[in-house]
């Protein structure tokens, strides 16, 4: 009763132990199953999902698969149920031969986590193989003299099954002479022997037919048979005998072919023919006869094929010795193959990637692989390594699995790919190794902005360049690849002189070549400051910029411009004054020119091209000063014409010319007296023009006559008052004067008081001259006279009026003349002679002020011929020579006031009623004009 109570407790204890063992195996990462051989394909083996503690759906999502090496896939995973099933036919005998138990090992890989689980499946045997003999019929020869008890070894049967399904017993059919005895060998196998129970008599029965049956222990029992034919021989009653029934040797697997490994010997007690022994290898179904060879006469056992420990660890060889008549004996040779390190480790790549991003974090898994060595023992112990200078390391997992992971951040710009060499080495002596190569590409990210080769650029463009010409190119390099390295170029938005930069230059977005969109002019634009932007095509794009300075180079495209003497607007030509008393080197005038170019293109030189009197004047090469080269002579003409050329130093040089008219005279009256000689002798006769002018002048004359009468009345009234007051004239010091004074300037003052009557040289017609308003401060030459408007009038009227005018005009004051300081030249360069006189009454002062203010107003409103202000010769302060008026010239002796018998002269002359001293010369000239 107590025993019955303890029974449940024992069961619980056994169950607990089994559970603990299962948990231990699971903890150790080992899953074990058992399955019979030859079961149908798709048969259930075990529930992997349950044993791993995962749901079937999670198992499928994590990517589970079976990893095995070196054999066909025998098992498969059902992704829906998570169960392990058979995938192919399983033959235990093919997989494990006689080994027991038959264990198959493989691994389960979870690809999501790269986790390995070991699975072991035991293949259980079924009785699917019957015992088989090597030969179906065996012939034995026994001498009739053989005594009872003689044993004859028989060929044993082979059963591929193991355990109870293996060979269990032998049986011999009943007979009177033979019995069967079964012995167990050292290898555990059963070997049948035929035992002679009774003496044979050949004459009674020459041949005995026996049947040997081999049976296994399966259910049902399977068996195999072999027929034995025993022939009874005469007289030879001794069979050969081996020196030992079983031979054992051990040889390394690298033993060379042809090597003798053993010599067997059998002896026969008979003599002569009955004692001649020959040796044979017993035919067997294995590969023994293909690996070894036994020489029939010597008994030498040699190798005829390479041994391989990995294919077979030992070989069992059956040998026979037979004498002449046919008596034989058998023995066994057990050859043990010793392992040598003849197999290098092998790589089995389970999972590997060919590309990794350069921004991957350290610890990123690159690949998973297994290392296996087919050798055994220390020869199969493997280690795996890789070069130390690579940013990778190996992490060992179970069952010689390794993970290749990164150790630091990667940079594609330093290394775009890695050729990783994995080295597996075994523990043999000498050690063998195997290399595996993994080509890993580093995928690019846009982590580098384009970079210019220089921090700034500068280039030079000649002006007047053709539109669309290439002027420069910039290049930026991006160390990234593909789109991340594709650089496009553009300009930063900017304006130049109020216009967008894009209207001046453009840039090819792909090549970085800059093109000029317009022809540059150095005088308008001398440089451009541009910011060039280089942008890659990454996401997001990166950019950088660089400054580019474009300098416009000057070309000699501007001829010199003459500032002085300027071309007058009324067609007149300026006349320079040179006194006859001028010494050599006297400064007559100065030609001033500028060139809008720069540098050597603006460097000017002056040359005298032509002169009416060669050798009289010279021109400064770099100053443009016109000076007398010798003293003036009486024979020198009054009018001297000079052609001055101004040339720059460009390539090719450009030039300009100016014509100067120099009047050689000491005083203004001399010039006025000889003015007729400077006028043209003929004026083209244009009848149509004369008709229009007559009508126009007649209308203007009426208006002008009324204006003159009113103005004269007003002036006489003011003059009368000034006589009563007898106010002394104030000095006008500090007042600037123009460079030179011409007849037009005087007429601008005189035209409000009178009109002039003259005769033309080519006709007897009379002309009434109404002077046009003259805005120039220069003397009038012949060219200016051609633009006067003439109106015909009766000859008698003109002569009468002229006689009245000349009879009432007082001789001019000849005391006034230009001093050396008043002539063109540097301000204050020469001392004046102080021979001029100053106005000394109110009327004289007012007249002089009116004349100066008229000239100043003309210069101020820009109508002057030279375009300058009063007293500046029409030049700016930069270019023009600085002249100051040392003495104001007295024009009073040349001014006639209608209705008065006096002329505007100094106070002394007015009181005395005489001409001033030195006026005789001028009086004679006036007399000549009256005669004409």
Swiss-Prot record:
Residues 806-841 have a biased composition (Polar residues). Residues 29-692 are extracellular. Glycans are attached at residues 419, 545, 685. Pfam families: Cadherin, Cadherin_2, Cadherin_C_2, Cadherin_tail. Keywords: Calcium, Cell adhesion, Cell membrane, Glycoprotein, Membrane, Repeat, Signal, Transmembrane, Transmembrane helix. Residues 714-932 are cytoplasmic. SMART domains: CA. It is found in: Cell membrane. GO terms for cellular component: plasma membrane. One of its GO terms (molecular function) is calcium ion binding. Residues 29-133, 134-242, 243-347, 348-452, 453-562, 570-682 form the Cadherin domain. The chain crosses the membrane at residues 693-713. Residues 1-28 form the signal peptide. Residues 922-932 have a biased composition (Basic residues). Residues 798-841, 902-932 are annotated as: Disordered. InterPro entries: Cadherin-like_dom, Cadherin-like_sf, Cadherin_C, Cadherin_CBD, Cadherin_CS, Cadherin_N, Protocadherin/Cadherin-CA. The keyword Membrane applies. It is a single-pass type I membrane protein. GO terms for biological process: cell adhesion; homophilic cell adhesion via plasma membrane adhesion molecules; nervous system development. PANTHER family: CADHERIN-87A, PROTOCADHERIN GAMMA-A2. Potential calcium-dependent cell-adhesion protein. May be involved in the establishment and maintenance of specific neuronal connections in the brain. This is Protocadherin gamma-A2. It comes from Homo sapiens (Human).
